Amino acid sequence: MKKGVILINLGGPDSLEAVEPFLYNLFSDPDIFSLPFQKVLAKIIAKLRAKKTRHYYELMGGKSPQYEQTLEQAKALQERLGEDYKVVVGMRYWKPYIKDALSELLKEGINEVILLPLYPQYSKTTTGSAFNEFERSKKALKADHIKVKKIEHFYDHPLYIKAWAEQIKQSVEKPEEYHFLFSAHSLPKKLIEEGDPYQEQTEKTVKLIMENFPEVEYTLAYQSKVGFGKWLEPSTDEVIRNLIKKEVKKLLVIPISFVSEHSETLYELDKQYRELAQELGYEEFVRVPTLRTNPYFISALEDLVKNEV
């Protein structure tokens, strides 16, 4: 019997018109923002942020590239796994949704499903939210009969680590000449204090990658803070401002939370932080591409799936 694999990611608007409803879906997720009158507030916040966010996507070509890149990953994984598996894509906050992916598998008579969120490090706000949405989808589709296996993380998988090491080596000829700046998506400190393992797992990922570059100095920083309150520190822009004072001239920026391109990489890192680095006088600002279909990364996904069977 064929098994189903759902590759899950955040999702992104596929047009400028989709920006506001995408933001509404994001801000109405109780696993990220637990607020009173959440849906009403989400509608207001989405409307307030839509114009600025649309501008980001205009600069990126009018849409997020994430769905197409996740499809490429699904195709590459499908080729590795062969005909005993059916690999589909389900997004958390935009089309095709996780429910759409499950529906596609059910139509083929598949009753064993492996969930593979493309978040290397576990957080209740990402992987946890995806799992909760899957359970709601399963109930809505009356699919309680199916067997489900969940892959929670792969932050320390040897092939995932090797993929990043190779990606770095392909980005610059002499990595030892650069200061490595790992930029991870930030989270509210409150979540970490409540036991979310994201920060600890991110630090472990960085440590394992750096075993391949023992002579290189590095910093882990956090980007993309949303709203108020205390978030993980130091922030990426703060680190960029501080390193130049320590006579660092060449930065190699590694988007450690991401396996495909997002607004966080294409706009924040490539535009905002690159411009900041240029203004501050850095000689070089090299941003390592996300893993996408890096062969070692696809091998890591293949291994994760096969070890769950």
Curated annotation (Swiss-Prot):
The entry lists its GO molecular-function terms as:
ferrochelatase activity; metal ion binding
Q: Say which domain of life the source belongs to.
A: Bacteria
Enzymatic class = lyase
Stated EC number for the protein is 4.98.1.1
Write out the residues that bind Fe cation.
185, 264
Keyword field: Cytoplasm, Heme biosynthesis, Iron, Lyase, Metal-binding, Porphyrin biosynthesis
| Pfam families, per the entry | Ferrochelatase
Q: Which GO terms describe its cellular component?
A: cytoplasm
Q: Which GO terms describe its biological process?
A: heme biosynthetic process
**Where's it found, cell-wise?**
Cytoplasm
Main location per the UniProt record: cytoplasm
Reaction equations catalysed: heme b + 2 H(+) = protoporphyrin IX + Fe(2+)
Q: In which pathway does it act?
A: Porphyrin-containing compound metabolism; protoheme biosynthesis; protoheme from protoporphyrin-IX: step 1/1
Q: Which Gene3D superfamilies match?
A: 3.40.50.1400
* Family listed: Belongs to the ferrochelatase family.
Alphabetized PANTHER family for the sequence: FERROCHELATASE (PTHR11108), FERROCHELATASE, MITOCHONDRIAL (PTHR11108:SF1)
Biological role: Catalyzes the ferrous insertion into protoporphyrin IX.
Show the HAMAP family listed in the entry: Ferrochelatase
The name this protein carries in UniProt is: Ferrochelatase
Supply the source organism for this entry: Aquifex aeolicus (strain VF5)
Q: Tell me the gene name.
A: hemH
